[in-house]
Amino acid sequence: MTSRPITPLLDTIRGPSDTRGLSVAQLEQLAREVRAEMIDAVSVTGGHLGSGLGVVELTVALHHVFDTPDDRIIWDVGHQCYPHKILTGRRDRIRTLRQGGGLSGFTLREESPYDPFGAGHSSTSISAGLGMAIGSALAGDARDVVAVIGDGSMSAGMAYEAMNNAGAAKSRLIVILNDNDMSIAPPVGAMSAYLSRLLSSKSWLSIRTLAKEIVARLPDALERTAKRAEEYARGMVTGGGTLFEEMGFYYVGPIDGHRMDHLVPVLRNVREAGRDGPVLIHVVTQKGKGYAPAENAPDKYHGVSRFNVVTGVQEKAKPQAPSYTAVFGKQLVAAAAKDHRIVAVTAAMPGGTGLDKLAAAYPQRCFDVGIAEQHAVTFAAGLACEGLKPFVALYSSFLQRGYDQVVHDVVLQKLPVRFAIDRAGFVGADGATHGGVFDMAFLGCLPNLVVMCAADEAELARMVVTAAGHDSGPIALRYPRGEGVGVEIPEDPQPLAIGKGRIVREGKGVALLSIGTRLQSCLEACEILAARGLTPTVADARFLKPFDEELVADLAARHEVLIVVEEGAIGGFCSHVATWLANQGLLDGGLKLRALHIPDRFFEHDAPEVQCAKAGIDAQAITTAVLDALKLETSATIDAGALKA
């Protein structure tokens, strides 16, 4: 274990106000110390490393120039917010990042007044910032609102919708484009820095405003010529910006995001200019800046487990079974080898969804559309219209962003699009913003859609094959984050019969009906109940839609107690089963039905097993539900012969 970094200047900082009297040289020292503190903290907790390292200087400069928290700084996505948390009074808890009861890995309104807007998903900052800017203006509050957004997030349409609105509204909003996909090249040198300072100065803004007013009075032909001349001139000196200018933004940049002597003057100029209308400052940074392993392999150090600071080697437990993501990726490649019509679509997550394997094997059949879930879904619908078999691989929480397209463009038209829904259920340290707990509720209500839920990796393999062969309409398969349970995966997985579940263990008296990941908890509960003399039947529903009505009716007829268990929110599988049982009159004869699902609240970051325990869907909760239904104490001895056979 390495010793804590030496941070004499940072040790004197209790909040952003303590940075405002510092010189540029002191700000540079503070940035170095914040970077060292962040590296050390993330080496202990794991988390998002590279993006935060890339914005250390920018973070220090922003809090130095702007009067936070009265001025608002909104961090898009939030991966990069660790330096911000260190500077805003949370340094003493920075080594609790993403731990149960500790700091969130994202910005969180209830955590600090310096977090004016919560994040986790991308491309929301400009919309939120514009709302805050207009809201403040209507209230008569003179404050600055700054939205910091990465170049990756600019691939989403929402960012441009917000910019279009901001340009038309002419509200005072500062957008900082954190461009970490460019190398720092000559355009970001001394001359560019000088021009950026000039273009952001109050005097230049005044001259330019006057010039625009004069041009507006010219005849149309002369006005067009003058505007075109200005575009050419600004393009030559700034290296770009015409697009943003056309959307109504005043463009400044690009500037070196790691040079405090470049950042501070530009930020101060923009703030002091007090210009009405939005401004975009183009800042070029390097992901992983200041930590060699992260600079050399930014993709591997975006999100990290615990690691050795000196070597950069991450601590990773030896896997006991392949991950569900890996199983999906492997099976999709196998299916694609047999059917040339299979293609895949991902929204900027080829590695995270396992599609990198397909991209390597069949690069022409794998499409990464960027952070654009809405487009991804409708693009896949178009592919299906032309006879292809598209698999759209998204995290459950990100599928929410394309829900209207699922309904309107796919399901309504019965197009055979396959949805591979990764990270279904609790996701642990990423918390509420990334939890995949709503998809069963929002997909289960849609006509024409088949929804499968994998209980283990072998079931997932069969579901990939099932989806590949399903051409009569849309179909979804959902599966959790992390490793499988260790079951053997068949060499040649066979498709499932649509809408048919399975009995996993025969018993009597009590039936446990699980869907998806909760099957293992049901089996664990059986072991606990066996010590009480109970031998429950265990069934795996496999399908949310259409669920196996024959199986449910059989379980209801043969048992006194039916416990339905899902790792999903209210309105999902439990609701479907309960409604059907009631409408069929199968609850009229005294069947004791209990529904175990995720309660009606959000669950913050913690270990997945802790989240399941808190939600009341783990083995102990299932055991308790059975005993309560039978009106038995946990220590009671069961007369198994008295139960319904």
Swiss-Prot record:
Oligomeric state and partners? Homodimer.
According to its UniProt record, the EC number is: 2.2.1.7
Intrachain disulfide bonds: none
- Is Metal-binding included in the keywords of this UniProt record? yes
Q: Which residues form the signal peptide?
A: none
Q: Which NCBIfam families match?
A: dxs (TIGR00204), PRK05444.2-2 (NF003933)
Tell me the cofactors it needs: Mg(2+); thiamine diphosphate
Q: What is this protein called?
A: 1-deoxy-D-xylulose-5-phosphate synthase 2
Q: Which family does it belong to?
A: Belongs to the transketolase family. DXPS subfamily.
Its ancestry begins with:
Bacteria, Pseudomonadati, Pseudomonadota, Alphaproteobacteria, Rhodospirillales
* Pathway noted in the entry: Metabolic intermediate biosynthesis; 1-deoxy-D-xylulose 5-phosphate biosynthesis; 1-deoxy-D-xylulose 5-phosphate from D-glyceraldehyde 3-phosphate and pyruvate: step 1/1
Q: Which gene encodes it?
A: dxs2
What PROSITE patterns does UniProt report for this protein, alphabetically? TRANSKETOLASE_1 (PS00801), TRANSKETOLASE_2 (PS00802)
Q: Which PANTHER family match?
A: 1-D-DEOXYXYLULOSE 5-PHOSPHATE SYNTHASE-RELATED, 1-DEOXY-D-XYLULOSE-5-PHOSPHATE SYNTHASE, CHLOROPLASTIC
The residues the record assigns to binding thiamine diphosphate are: H79, G120, H121, S122, G152, S153, N180, Y291, E373
Q: Name one GO biological process term.
A: 1-deoxy-D-xylulose 5-phosphate biosynthetic process
